[in-house]
Amino acid sequence: MRTHLPLNALRAFEASARHLNFTKAALELYVTQGAVSQQVRMLEERLGVILFKRLPRGLEMTDDAQILFSVLTTAFSDIERVFKQFERGEYRDVVSIAAVGTFAVGWLLPRLAEFRQLYPRIELNLRTNNNVVNLATEGLDFAIRFGEGLWPLTHNKALFSAPLTVLCSSDTAKPLQHPTDLINETLYRSYREDEWLQWFEKANMSPIKITGSIFDPSRLMIESAIYEGGVALAPAKMFSREIENGQLVQPFKIEVELGKYWLTYLKSKPMTASMEIFQQWLMNEALKEISE
């Protein structure tokens, strides 16, 4: 038998946690500030915990409140999404994904048409980020990240590595006969300062001062290398189209591996059938990438 959930109290808490203010929550819910405060107090009594620290100019969530808020955010978001789809008469199961921008544009997007043909009843909601993501508070099913797979709250499945290499336009590449020739070029880098240092070490050369701009994401760095000159350090796998059409060249075969792309999802979130389908499809596509 299911436990009777105090839905009004949960809604009052969720709005209060989002605004960190009872008055703003009351305006959103079309009730009085006193009613919201009372609902939250009832919820605290039922759970046996304190959810907010009452401050002179607002509220501060306790650790217990943070846990409850992350669950409710996902739940209310899912309910609202499905409700709107029923209203429009176009219900489809949605899988929400956040991906590093370089991966999303350079690798995932060109493959999504095939997924949609195979699974027309599954709608993929894709957004990009700079490798910083909170699956719980953002209501995400999956996040595709770059790194070493050491995220404690998620299941982390390796997709493939994407070694960094020197990329530039064909004109910029003409005088580059040896890695030390880079001393005469403008070198771009991402927010990770150590990337070039590790590439220099792999090339058995002394470090060169990085004088170019700092870019986040890598795609902006590549655009600058193509249209303004300069040299980028980026994963060639993510820019295969630009290499194939001659916009980019790889003047040296030297590559440095600093991590992998990973498919991650919360340990606390049950896997839906549509999530299983997307996960299996993505892992199969990643295997194709590795075998090529």
From Swiss-Prot:
UniProt keyword terms in alphabetical order: Activator, DNA-binding, Transcription, Transcription regulation
Effect of residue 217 to S: In strain: 5E78-1
Domain of life: Bacteria
Record domain HTH lysR-type: where: 5-62
Keyword DNA-binding: yes
Effect of residue 284 to S: In strain: 5E78-1
A Pfam family reported for this protein in Swiss-Prot or TrEMBL: LysR_substrate
A GO term, aspect molecular function: DNA-binding transcription factor activity
PANTHER family, per the entry: HTH-TYPE TRANSCRIPTIONAL ACTIVATOR AMPR, HTH-TYPE TRANSCRIPTIONAL REGULATOR
Function: Positive regulator of the expression of the gene (blaB) for beta-lactamase.
Protein name (record): HTH-type transcriptional regulator BlaA
Organism this protein belongs to: Proteus vulgaris
